[in-house]
Amino acid sequence: MAQIKITLTKSPIGRKPEQRKTVVALGLGKLNSSVVKEDNPAILGMVNAISHLVTVEEVK
């Protein structure tokens, strides 16, 4: 399966609690932190919920 790199580009401060929990669940902490995750529907749904806070790149 393909992998994606998720980078936190905006702060979750002042956002809804569900969005902050999603950021933590993805393993993102400080700004500009990145994680590499498998490209599956569960992860893509989480990324879609906080798409205004993160950038996503495909990893080869």
Swiss-Prot record:
Q: Which domain of life is it from?
A: Bacteria
Pfam (any one): Ribosomal_L30
- Residue ranges of coiled coil: none
Report the GO terms under cellular component. Answer: cytosolic large ribosomal subunit
Picking any one GO molecular function of the record gives: structural constituent of ribosome
Under InterPro entries, the record lists:
Ribo_uL30_ferredoxin-like_sf (IPR036919), Ribosomal_uL30_bac-type (IPR005996), Ribosomal_uL30_CS (IPR018038), Ribosomal_uL30_ferredoxin-like (IPR016082)
According to its UniProt entry, the protein's GO biological process terms are:
translation
**Keywords assigned:** Ribonucleoprotein, Ribosomal protein
Would the keyword Ribosomal protein turn up in this protein's UniProt record? yes
TM helices/strands, residue ranges: none
Q: How does it assemble?
A: Part of the 50S ribosomal subunit.
PANTHER family the record matches: LARGE RIBOSOMAL SUBUNIT PROTEIN UL30M (PTHR15892:SF2), MITOCHONDRIAL RIBOSOMAL PROTEIN L30 (PTHR15892)
Q: Which family does it belong to?
A: Belongs to the universal ribosomal protein uL30 family.
**What is this protein's name?**
Large ribosomal subunit protein uL30
Species whose genome carries this gene: Streptococcus suis (strain 05ZYH33)
Its lineage reads:
Bacteria, Bacillati, Bacillota, Bacilli, Lactobacillales
> What gene is behind this protein?
rpmD
